Amino acid sequence: MESFQQIKNNKVDLISTNDPLDKNRLLIEDLWESVLREECPDDQAERLIQLKELSYSKQIEGDSSKTFKKEIVDIVNSMDLAESIAAARAFSLYFQLVNILEQRVEEDRYIQSFTNKNVQKSPDNLDPFAPALARQNAPVTFRELFYRLRKLNVPPGKLEELLQEMDIRLVFTAHPTEIVRHTIRHKQTRVANLLKKIQVEQFLTKEEKNFLKIQLKEEVRLWWRTDELHQFKPSVLDEVDYALHYFQQVLFNAMPQLRGRIAEALTENYPDVQLPSQSFCNFGSWVGSDRDGNPSVTPEITWRTACYQRQLMLERYITATSHLRDQLSVSMQWSQVSSSLLESLETDRVKFPAIYEARATRYRSEPYRLKLSYILEKLRLTQERNNLLADNGWKFDLEGELNTKNIDKVENLYYKSVNEFTYDLELIKNSLISTDLTCEAVNTLLTQVHIFGFSLASLDIRQESTRHSDAIQELTKYLDLSVQYDQMSEDEKIKWLVDELNTKRPLIPSDVKWTNTTEETFSVFKMVKRLQQEFGSRICHAYVISMSHSASDLLEVLLLAKEMGLLDQNSKNSNLLVVPLFETVEDLKRAPEVMEKLFKLDFYKSLLPKVGESFKPLQELMLGYSDSNKDSGFVSSNWEIHRAQIALQNLASRNNILLRLFHGRGGSVGRGGGPAYQAILAQPSGTLKGRIKITEQGEVLASKYSLPELALYNLETVTTAVIQNSLVNNRLDATPEWNQLMSRLAETSRSHYRKLVYENPDLLNFFQEVTPIEEISKLQISSRPARRKKGAKDLSSLRAIPWVFGWTQSRFLLPSWFGVGTALSSELNSDPQQIELLRVLHQRWPFFRMLISKVEMTLSKVDLEVAKYYVDTLGSEENKDSFDDIFEVISKEYSLTKSLVLEITGKNKLLESDRDLKSSVSLRNKTIIPLGFLQVSLLRRLRDQTRQPPISEFLIDKDESRRAYSRSELLRGALLTINGIAAGMRNTG
């Protein structure tokens, strides 16, 4: 069995086999075609295969683009509904297989870069980072990084100081457009693992390889017969389960390896530098705790999420401890043990007589096994307690319940904190060391405990600012203040809030029935208090205020925290870190002014947590990429975030405050996404200082964390970029001429973007008619609504994620580039010589290079011929003229932007300098075309029926009298095309 099915293969001429990626694509092509031939009727399978080859080969042969696309349109329009659904599923499967393959190739390249001891060197008189920069999207490894830092004469002491202070936090989020079912993700992982085995062909016999191919084909056929669409709207706890999958399957084991790799690289280049014992990379989560615009996230849900996370960690620790007990068979007949360990065994014997009776005979001369038996029992008791808490909710008084029922308390038997578990493991480790023994499994488990604790990830609470001000307004109305809260000026609000924060008497009466919304707001703070009592402050410490506009927004949250016991006035200690999220461009501009007001309040500064050896106060601030981009366009959003970081860091330094910037990046370029290495290096010099917090959106989790080496690649990429940015100061961000140029570009691009998006009265109708935005809202893919306000249909209520999603599906990708060309053109029209300055910026300034790189990548994915088909076919007749005008504006801006980007980069074609990315995008751009036309065909038929409600649910299509079909079937077909295009574009929103 040389291939999945012996067929004539004419794709060899289409794909170069010199590259590993191209070579393996042939395997995927063969697999895909073989599955279609077995799962579809013969004529249908051949038609689908020909359709894909037509979309690919015709462009390569140089046929007129419009002519060959018309051929595809004719084929698509001739399909009945069953064929259309089969086509949507087939192309979706194809792209998902290609995605798996590309991830596997990325994984292999990372393994090669890690195992390659020969660091790519640059001449002594050049920038040691030049080879890395030349590769653009190829990050350096730990080994490369430390070698280059040594060449730059970075002192060991400076590096060690940074490592001591380094604090990287990656925050997983649920995603309103996470398109792939959890069930399908599992199948993708199995396919990836089988591909990995097949690709080591030099170690396989012909029979072994053929057997693996049979297994691979079986898995994909099972996948084909699995429903791709969610059958019900996922609950928040479903989303929690989805996010926890990556911790359970990948990250739990990957994190100790990451630490091992950085330690090995330090030993080679900086042998005197000690890696600190604490974790430099930690995880957070919004899944189950982000309640902004999601009424499904209740206090009860957040409580159960915390219990689920602890349950997962306890399960992993029980498994690891059981393996340790099998391994640590050291006998006292042949080895000493520490006196501390022996003393602990005696203490445990008294506490756990049943365990002693059951295990003492078997392990009487094996002290480590006996100790680990006691540890296992403590973990199981902790697990039992956790299950009780999860089942009964956050208001459940466990201790009171036990007392009432006269049940003996399990006092001192379960682990009350992770520190007790750590102490037991340290006893074992130190006893081994005292007798000249080591056990890597013990060290690995200790590393995992240091990183994950019992909490797994910190849960950030997020809520929109008006929820707090509305609650306080209701409170002040009840208290009958002389001036109601909503009538106060900002200065009056600050004074009243600070006075109340300094008052020890309670403000909120306990016996009042509040409105449901206010009661919910108060309950969140009560639940957080209970969470911290049970789990410790690590489980839930940060409270993010979305749409922060003013200093009072933060003080309101502190006041509510004080009322619920989260703030100790005597010790000036707050158990809640209040984090403002500045989202719009105007709010980003005002952010330094807002924070300066707060830093001038001694009371506020005293509440900030003190961190590090310096024991300085720490302020965390979040910067929103999504809404600022939707509000003002790509250039303006990125520039204002860049400027805000510099201004905020300068402000913090003047006030002797440490700053941790939290970047709310999305998966797509229109929401701050893109290569992490480039993005972090592009942060203003001096703003990181080893500290960064970044959202990891639900839609990109699979591409970053589905495979072990992929996860390590991403984690090493982020860590090396943070170290490089913090230690290698390029000082280019302070160049006045460059800053002035960027400010002009930002203002011009913002003006042009807003003229189209917010000032053109027809744009909203255009977006709703020519993109599948309304159908996207019918996908059962998220617990969160697509709009902030129920029933609202204006742009302001639409979330940034579906905004980007709709433009991506229709191949405009408008939020990621519109306005750039006009801004650049305006600059060059005033002074043509500025092109040289722009080229210098692209070559030397990481921020500008990142900006142009993202625009270039996005432009390469745009297909205006396909987009025009959406406009012509889906646009209503009454809007034809205005829609044509809008498309003309978009088309001109695209051409202008593309030509000027190429002029700046000095290339003839987009992505010319990144062969791998260009190859991937080219394959997708060509093969995805039928899906776009298919989506338009299905949307047109679906909307025609919606506009003219039929007497019966079942109809005969006016274009195809072959069979009856239902409106729900049409919707299903349309949703399947959304799945396929999302897979082909490799992102949604």
Curated annotation (Swiss-Prot):
InterPro entries found in the cross-reference section: PEP_COase (IPR021135), PEP_COase_bac/pln-type (IPR022805), PEP_COase_Lys_AS (IPR018129), PEPCASE_His_AS (IPR033129), Pyrv/PenolPyrv_kinase-like_dom (IPR015813)
Positions of the catalytic residues: H175, K630
Enzyme class: lyase
Function: Forms oxaloacetate, a four-carbon dicarboxylic acid source for the tricarboxylic acid cycle.
Organism from which the protein derives: Prochlorococcus marinus (strain MIT 9312)
Name this polypeptide is given: Phosphoenolpyruvate carboxylase
Organism superkingdom: Bacteria
Catalyzed chemical reaction(s): oxaloacetate + phosphate = phosphoenolpyruvate + hydrogencarbonate
GO molecular function: magnesium ion binding; phosphoenolpyruvate carboxylase activity
UniProt-listed GO biological process terms: carbon fixation; oxaloacetate metabolic process; tricarboxylic acid cycle
Any one GO CC term of the record: cytosol
EC number from the UniProt entry: 4.1.1.31
Sequence intervals crossing the membrane: none
Family: Belongs to the PEPCase type 1 family.
Keywords: Carbon dioxide fixation, Lyase, Magnesium
Swiss-Prot/TrEMBL cofactor(s): Mg(2+)
